[in-house]
Amino acid sequence: MTLNRKCVVIHNGSHRTVAGFSNVELPQCIIPSSYIKRTDEGGEAEFIFGTYNMIDAAAEKRNGDEVYTLVDSQGLPYNWDALEMQWRYLYDTQLKVSPEELPLVITMPATNGKPDMAILERYYELAFDKLNVPVFQIVIEPLAIALSMGKSSAFVIDIGASGCNVTPIIDGIVVKNAVVRSKFGGDFLDFQVHERLAPLIKEENDMENMADEQKRSTDVWYEASTWIQQFKSTMLQVSEKDLFELERYYKEQADIYAKQQEQLKQMDQQLQYTALTGSPNNPLVQKKNFLFKPLNKTLTLDLKECYQFAEYLFKPQLISDKFSPEDGLGPLMAKSVKKAGASINSMKANTSTNPNGLGTSHINTNVGDNNSTASSSNISPEQVYSLLLTNVIITGSTSLIEGMEQRIIKELSIRFPQYKLTTFANQVMMDRKIQGWLGALTMANLPSWSLGKWYSKEDYETLKRDRKQSQATNATN
């Protein structure tokens, strides 16, 4: 194999799938991580992939059409037959290359435990048995993002569609015990936006705006992929501080202003002149307009309401008492940092590789070796805090909401006031959305094959033989 290799790079995120080649900086395609299943008159099932194909199919509003996802809330595949069809669609329609021709690199989310061996085996089965890929590599997404930015230690905050994932990385190693996540992300905001705007966009005697239980899954997906996305990108904002604190501040300012006006009125009566009148500036009552194109209707909301949507990510208990305040983004980040500091002394034990070879743990198998873990296990928790908080990486599509980076800095500074904070967030919107794929692209372009953990079909066959022998031995015992 030569150093000037070309690989296929596929990133299956919870919302979108990105695919391309390692020798091209931009992906070949970005499609939804879902598909529409349609049954024709003959009873044959048709599977529709691709953004425009799915939008066109959903707009037809055909009875029986349903939208299905490929990955679960953890970002791991569960619909393997559909995943195979999606990859074949990518190879045949978008990449226009045979799977047998090029190596394959894919991403996998970080978890707070050892990767499920069953998940890894299904990946290898799909790659080697069904697609006949020559060699194959799985990279941990937040680790790839950190290394692609030149950071061996980082605190990766990924605010995506299915939720928020917080991953601390020390010396190129994911601190598995400190990986935390919440279910509050872009999809959660989609639902809240729909619930809030439904009464505003519903017209009298409009049969298309009936109760949600009568909507098809294709209708829900279509709305989330069109006008709701536009609403979130243009209307939503994150307040720099707690929204309740902001309201209290402006209320206090209004009270002070009222007292000043009362004093001026008394002076007016004594000095016989008219004081200037006006009102204090309260940005929360300013209006923002959104054009709802399906009905050509303008929707008007207070700025406070625009802040309120994003506030749910930091305080989910505002929606329901059933949601814990600990699942808010602020407590989640603090929990991850503290757990990383507490568990760093046992990291060396957590980074041992699986003797079977294919089931790798969240160790940086792509750079360095286990010698680097010895130094990381000797640092103090305070040093871990400082190392993480000076290398905060903010990524994910939902992190693009205006004001998100400033609010994250505020939340961390409240909980760790004695530490310096440094954040890194890609300011190019598209790059932020596909940063997981860009990280995998970097890992695919390492200068030497030996720096990456590549697996061949022979390795997979060896694993299967060893597993069968182990099962036979256990059965006889």
UniProtKB/Swiss-Prot annotation:
Question: Taking the first listed entry, what is the main subcellular location of this protein, grouped into a coarse class?
Answer: nucleus
- Subcellular location as annotated: Nucleus
Kindly name one Pfam family recorded for this protein: Actin
GO cellular-component terms in the record?
chromatin; NuA4 histone acetyltransferase complex; nucleus; RSC-type complex; SWI/SNF complex
> Which keywords, in A-to-Z order, does the entry hold?
Chromatin regulator, Nucleus, Transcription, Transcription regulation
Please describe, based on the UniProt annotation, the reported consequence of changing residue 411 to K: Impaired heterodimerization with ARP9. Temperature-sensitive phenotype. Moderate suppressor of Ty phenotype
Does the record bear Transcription in its keywords?
Answer: yes
User: Sorted alphabetically, which CDD domains does this protein's record hold?
Assistant: ASKHA_NBD_ScArp7-like (cd10212)
- Name the Gene Ontology biological process terms: chromatin organization; chromatin remodeling; nucleosome disassembly; positive regulation of transcription by RNA polymerase II; regulation of DNA-templated transcription; regulation of transcription by RNA polymerase II; transcription elongation by RNA polymerase II
GO molecular function ontology, one term from the record: structural molecule activity
How this chain assembles, per its entry, is: Forms a heterodimer with ARP9. Interacts with NPL6. Component of the two forms of the RSC complex composed of at least either RSC1 or RSC2, and ARP7, ARP9, LDB7, NPL6, RSC3, RSC30, RSC4, RSC58, RSC6, RSC8, RSC9, SFH1, STH1, HTL1 and probably RTT102. The complexes interact with histone and histone variant components of centromeric chromatin. Component of the SWI/SNF global transcription activator complex.
* Family from the record: Belongs to the actin family.
Q: What does this protein do?
A: Component of the chromatin structure remodeling complex (RSC), which is involved in transcription regulation and nucleosome positioning. RSC is responsible for the transfer of a histone octamer from a nucleosome core particle to naked DNA. The reaction requires ATP and involves an activated RSC-nucleosome intermediate. Remodeling reaction also involves DNA translocation, DNA twist and conformational change.
**What other note does the entry give for this protein?**
Present with 1360 molecules/cell in log phase SD medium.
Q: From the Swiss-Prot or TrEMBL record, give the protein name.
A: Actin-related protein 7
Name of the gene encoding the protein in the UniProt record: ARP7
